[in-house]
Amino acid sequence: GSNSVAAYIATPHGCGSDWGSVAPKEYWQEVRRICDHYDVLLIADEVVTGFGRTGKWFAMEHFGVEVDIMVTAKGISGCYIPMGAVMVSDEINKPFEEGNAYFVHGFTNGGHPVACAAGSKAIDIYREDNLVENSEKMGEHLFTYKEQFLAHPSVIESRGWGLCMTLELVESKESGEYFPSSKGAEGIFHSIAMKNGLVFYSTLYGQRREPMFKRGLPLMICPPLSINEEQIDDLVSRLDTTLHEWEAEMGVS
């Protein structure tokens, strides 16, 4: 029952084994309402999406929902050094602030001065160079190519925000049939992409074993937040070429 549930945790924007799934806005608003009703904490996993990746400082901003706890990493230091952080609401922090509770969370490398210095400087650069705003603007430019990608016979769906786009690749757009692992579709794709000067995040979730869900290959397009329009145009041109060559190799038409 509800009295056995302490918290609900999920990511606002998929970025890996979940095929880059993005929930409709109403979903998170309803989750927030249910959590409030049953006194359940809402935790956002922004390890990948935090610090500008989706065109906002944090992806939950797209939904207009405030969470109780947020976990972050990766972008907090610009990925220059391993670092993670947990942020909490004023309500969660209140017992600790008043001295009625203690946060027992010490471990060997906690509060590492080099990591903290890198994180502090990374956040300064995000602000000084307007990288979050650039992510939003360049994301809008990237998504102007959405229909061009969808015109490919292998691309069944395109989704995401900011500089985090997912293309779902299938063997047959009509049936939505996915590539069996025996065909090695993703490995072939990445080889062709590298030949064309592109390196993508290798998901491989559906290629190491038969996927739990019959879904296409998730191609994650996540360029640096500092990218400009000319570089996006070049990226799209190279990806378009890669898709054509890969589809010919895989017999997708």
PLM regions and their residue ranges:
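Conserved N-terminal phosphate-binding loop of PLP-dependent enzymes in the Aspartate aminotransferase
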Residues: 1-253
